[in-house]
């Protein structure tokens, strides 16, 4: 199961007493702010959660799996996420209890 924006909206609706339209707008604005910051080349740092950063990947050789032909994979910019220590600790504690 995955957490969705609809789930987040529902949680804001139930826990904070916002109406569904307001809750949906807050969730959408949150993600739009993250998108805008990343589009402008800024890192996004969410204390206690983690960091979203941009990383430039250089061109590298690739291979067509069907033909075996070498094909260059073009340079590109990707978004990476690095979890913070608090998030890591909570995930590890939860995962440790499930084993």
UniProtKB/Swiss-Prot annotation:
Pfam families: Bac_DNA_binding (PF00216). GO terms for cellular component: cytosol. Belongs to the bacterial histone-like protein family. Heterodimer of an alpha and a beta chain. This protein is one of the two subunits of integration host factor, a specific DNA-binding protein that functions in genetic recombination as well as in transcriptional and translational control. NCBIfam families: himA (TIGR00987), PRK00285.1 (NF001401). This is Integration host factor subunit alpha.
């Amino acid at each position: 199961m995955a957490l969705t924006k609809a789930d987040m909206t529902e949680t804001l609706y139930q826990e904070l007493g916002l109406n569904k339209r307001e809750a949906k707008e807050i969730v959408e604005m949150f993600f739009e702010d993250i998108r805008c910051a990343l589009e402008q080349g800024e890192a996004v740092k969410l204390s206690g959660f983690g960091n979203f950063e941009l990383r430039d990947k250089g061109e590298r050789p690739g291979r067509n799996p069907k033909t075996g032909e070498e094909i260059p994979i073009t340079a590109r910019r990707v978004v990476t996420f690095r979890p913070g220590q608090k998030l890591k600790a909570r995930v590890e504690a939860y995962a440790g209890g499930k084993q």
